[in-house]
C-alpha cells in the first residue's frame, strides 16, 4: 500500500528533489544523493487526492499530481492544495484521442499555438509550471517544442527507466509502479 511505500522511503533516508534539481541533475550541473526519488501521480484522480494526500502530509513527503485541468481542475486545486502535493500540468484538454497516425493523443495533431495555449491554461489553473506529463506519454519533436515554449523546465514520458545525467529534461523517463504491488516489488524498483 502507498503508506508502507512512503514509510519505507522515509525510514531509508530517500531524498525528494525538486523539479529544478532534477533539471540540474540531468544537465550535469548538480549531484543528487543516490537514493533520490520524485513521486508522481497522473490524472489527478479523486481516489489519489482523498487517499494519497493524507499519507504525504503525515510523512511530510513531497509529491507531484499531474492534473488534467479541464477535469474539474480548478476545484481540485482549491480543495486539495497543500504543502506536500504540488499540482502540475497533464494538459488542460489534450488527454484525449485524435493524434496523428502512430500516436494516440490529440497533442501530436495540434498546432503549436493551440498546444501552447492549452499548456498555459493548465499552468494558470495548477498554479505551477515546473513539470508536465505528456498525455499517454505520447509526444513528437513539435510537442516537446510546445512544452518548452510554454515554459516548463521538466516533462515526463512513460519510458520505463530511471533518469540519468544526459537525459533531455523535457523527455524524462519514469519508473512505473503497479497498483497492488508488494512492498518487496516496490523496494526492488527504487533501489
Regions found by a protein language model. Name each.
Residues 1, 33-37, 45-47, 51, ...:
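Metal-dependent polysaccharide deacetylase catalytic core of the NodB/CE4 family, i.e.
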Residues 15, 130, 153:
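Short acidic/polar active-site loop segments enriched in Thr and Asp
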Residues 41, 152-161:
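Acidic, His- and aromatic-enriched active-site or binding-groove loops in soluble protein domains
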Residues 6-10, 53, 57, 123, ...:
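Non-transmembrane alpha-helical segments in soluble domains
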